[in-house]
Amino acid sequence: MAAEPLTELEAAIETVVTTFFTFAGREGRKGSLSVNEFKELVTQQLPHLLKDVGSLDEKMKSLDVNQDSELKFSEYWRLIGELAKEIRKEKALEIRKK
């Protein structure tokens, strides 16, 4: 029996998770992003949303709650949450202008 296709939201969530694991563990521990893996993920997958972030090293430090120089999925998820909040703000401004 074929699985039903994912909804747009389900596919988006799967993409967020898959992207993390595509980049995580290439250098350091599997299941976490090293500094270089984080930079590679951001520059390849988030170039438009994080173009004004400033130093990626500083952004990494702000997300790295346990300060182990790696991002676990929960720390990476904080970045996704921050980006979603910014997009929501932009959408709210667009709605107000209408």
Curated annotation (Swiss-Prot):
CDD domains in the cross-refs: S-100A13
Ligand binding (Ca(2+) 2): D64, N66, D68, E70, E75
Binding residues for Ca(2+) 1: S32, E37
Name of the protein: Protein S100-A13
Subunit structure of this chain's protein: Homodimer. Part of a copper-dependent multiprotein complex containing S100A13, FGF1 and SYT1. Interacts with FGF1 and SYT1. Interacts with IL1A.
Pfam families reported for this sequence: S_100
Summary of the function given for this chain in its UniProt record: Plays a role in the export of proteins that lack a signal peptide and are secreted by an alternative pathway. Binds two calcium ions per subunit. Binds one copper ion. Binding of one copper ion does not interfere with calcium binding. Required for the copper-dependent stress-induced export of IL1A and FGF1. The calcium-free protein binds to lipid vesicles containing phosphatidylserine, but not to vesicles containing phosphatidylcholine.
Coiled coil: none
